[in-house]
Amino acid sequence: MRTFVVALALSALCAAGAPVVAQEGHPLKGSWIGTWAGNTVHGNDLFMVLDWNGKAITGTINPGQDNIVIKSATLNPEGWVLHFEAEGKDKAGAVINYVVDGKIENLAMHNRSVTGTWKSQRGTGAFKITRQ
């Protein structure tokens, strides 16, 4: 009996020291930084905050002065293909509509990325963001 208690105590001690891995939730949820190359209206660098409310992907690009609101977004789990449309304004107040298409890379990693292309009525280019 005493051996059993000692073995049980050692097992509990080992289990307490083991790392705990939690489920992360939606693969797009979180803060992202990256670039949309060649964007002369809003600059090459971008910061995004994305969320999943249980029904839809929501978010903002460059929150603050350059708020670009994501109007619609879809994520196809087959191939992890992302499509979103966003609306911002240039310095004169004219509406700029963005369409971004990309694919999630390194899905299993915390610092996964989305790589693809962006386009608007003012240009097009490469798009890449990495989750922070």
Predicted regions and their residues:
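Bacterial N-terminal signal peptides
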Residues: 7-16
